[in-house]
């Protein structure tokens, strides 16, 4: 369940109620045999399912993996970084003042639309301990307290980004 912390208020999502049986509808709403046969041959769009709701995006931005969860504790952050290192990924820190995609000067996507964050120092090649990454996060947060900071794990063999999560949000 989401908890409200910040500008957006949390909304409670109702429990899954499932599909309703047509037995409770009046006979005028019941399908003819032809309609029932057609329904059996086609897929349902789930129109009677009431559990699907949209996360309210206004004043409640979400950023990366794990961003729907509460802020990571120090212990949870260490576990995530250890997972990253255990998979032999190279940790890298990035920071940005906005933390989300924003297009100020043009409608089409491009380099300056907020997708690319500023890299904090160099990727941490040869990093073997989570404490090294945590110390860099602290140092970056001290230098840029009003910035969003994320940790990225790169696989330098496949040359892809494998994990990315926010580790610091501005107050």
Swiss-Prot record:
Residues 1-50 form a transit peptide. GO terms for molecular function: ribulose-bisphosphate carboxylase activity. Its main location: plastid. It holds the Pfam family RuBisCO_small. It is found in: Plastid, Chloroplast. Keywords: Calvin cycle, Carbon dioxide fixation, Chloroplast, Photorespiration, Photosynthesis, Plastid, Transit peptide. It comes from the Eukaryota. One of its GO terms (cellular component) is chloroplast. PANTHER family: RIBULOSE BISPHOSPHATE CARBOXYLASE SMALL CHAIN 1, CHLOROPLASTIC, RIBULOSE BISPHOSPHATE CARBOXYLASE SMALL SUBUNIT 1A, CHLOROPLASTIC-RELATED. Heterohexadecamer of 8 large and 8 small subunits. RuBisCO catalyzes two reactions: the carboxylation of D-ribulose 1,5-bisphosphate, the primary event in carbon dioxide fixation, as well as the oxidative fragmentation of the pentose substrate. Both reactions occur simultaneously and in competition at the same active site. Although the small subunit is not catalytic it is essential for maximal activity. The basic functional RuBisCO is composed of a large chain homodimer in a 'head-to-tail' conformation. In form I RuBisCO this homodimer is arranged in a barrel-like tetramer with the small subunits forming a tetrameric 'cap' on each end of the 'barrel'. Belongs to the RuBisCO small chain family. This is Ribulose bisphosphate carboxylase small subunit, chloroplastic. It comes from Pinus thunbergii.
